Amino acid sequence: SYNLRLPGYHFDLEREIVGSIRYIEKRLAPEGKKVKLFLWTGDCIPGRNALVWTQRAGVMNMNGGDTLATRSLPTVTEVEGLGIEREGLFQVFAPNQNENVYTNEWRGPFYGFERVIETFEFTEQPRRLKPINIYFHTYLTTKVAGMRSLDKVFAYALAQEITPVFASDYARK
């Protein structure tokens, strides 16, 4: 399991979810701006209690899913749905996957994220199945190949005729 053992720390969903929201609103966001969307981290498989806490906090939630249709996997079975019901609550899946998936969990090839373009193209025709969503972690830019792949992905997206939508609006639909 991927975790950092911290002396004296005990996992608490309220602290993790509500505490994160409060921290962002008080210290990071512009004054008066409210958090609308909570993005799951790690394996992105929240339990029902985690979904309950986002609901109590008045925010939507998103991440997870494994849309990975590419030229080497050209099948709609590699396109995830909009999300999944978890014991009466709904988790919205991210439209596309991040670099971690395309780089074999950051083991390489580090240019692998450019393959998300194949996913964008596959889910575009004959009709749009998933929106273009550039979802990456900043560590991608620690490798030259990762930075170049990100440049390619942004260049591709900017060359498309798109309708911009905030992630919070996508999750609401």
Where are these regions (language model features)?
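Metal-dependent polysaccharide deacetylase catalytic core of the NodB/CE4 family, i.e.
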Residues: 1-49, 57-78, 129-133
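Alpha-helical scaffold elements lining the catalytic groove of polysaccharide deacetylases
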Residues: 2-29, 81-124
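Solvent-exposed, polar/charged alpha-helical surfaces in well-ordered, non-transmembrane soluble domains
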Residues: 18, 22, 52, 148-151, ...
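Eukaryote-specific, cytoplasm-facing alpha-helical/coiled-coil scaffolding segments in long proteins
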Residues: 44-52, 76-84, 160-164
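Structural alpha-beta junctions
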Residues: 56-62, 154-167
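Short conserved micro-motifs at the rims of enzyme active sites and ligand-binding pockets
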Residues: 73-74, 144-147
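Short acidic, S/G/P-rich loop/turn micro-motifs used as interaction or catalytic elements
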Residues: 139-143
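Surface beta-strand/loop "capping" patches
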Residues: 171-173
